[in-house]
């Protein structure tokens, strides 16, 4: 049997403003009765006050270093300058005290119990709406590994991201026998009026 205490939903807050979204993620998971731990990664620029508020709703608040794609040209073209620090989610692979994690962006809203995502294999993700050959890293099933973390960092430093997000940063699995490079998830994607993406999981 699977030890559910060794599995976690993970989100991330790189600013005080993102703490509000992360809190909404945690509350929506608890509202629908998740049996897994709920973890938030925060960067040093998140204030102590915000971190204390996160401890009220999360099981763990983990401090990580800020990574930045520094791809200002593509970020400007996409009109998404806030995406620069999204490489920070690569630190999910350092959470090796968990056997499996499901990463949810801070703009994700859970609308039912989604614990079944832990039955999925690494690397499960949804196709990116704008780039179907790549995956969108807003909802991602992964197995923490220090070695994978090292490889992802090396890949990010060497290749960066063609759109400023991590969707293209992770080296995709080799495709063999006609198989997918990654396991596809289905979820509804609805842009907010502000043009920021939000992921609604049914």
What would you call each of these model-derived segments?
Residues 18-19, 82-86:
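A conditional alpha-helix N-cap/helix-loop micro-motif detector
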């Amino acid at each position: 049997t699977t030890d559910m205490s060794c599995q976690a939903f993970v989100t991330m807050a790189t600013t005080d403003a993102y703490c509000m979204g992360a809190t909404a993620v945690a509350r929506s998971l608890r509202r629908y009765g998740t049996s897994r731990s709920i973890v938030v990664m925060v960067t040093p620029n998140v204030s102590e006050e915000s971190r204390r508020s996160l401890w009220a709703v999360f099981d763990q608040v983990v401090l990580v270093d800020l990574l930045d794609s520094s791809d200002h040209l593509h970020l400007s073209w996409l009109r998404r300058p806030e995406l620069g620090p999204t490489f920070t989610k690569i630190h999910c692979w350092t959470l090796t005290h968990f056997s499996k994690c499901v990463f949810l962006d801070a703009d994700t809203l859970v609308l039912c119990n989604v614990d079944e995502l832990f039955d999925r294999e690494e690397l499960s993700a949804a196709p990116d709406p704008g780039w179907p050959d790549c995956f969108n890293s807003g909802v991602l099933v992964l197995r923490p590994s220090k070695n994978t973390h090292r490889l992802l960092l090396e890949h990010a430093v060497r290749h960066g991201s063609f759109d400023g997000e991590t969707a293209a940063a992770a080296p995709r699995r080799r495709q063999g026998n006609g198989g997918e490079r990654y396991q596809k998830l289905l979820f509804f994607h609805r842009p907010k009026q502000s043009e920021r993406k939000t992921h609604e999981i049914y």
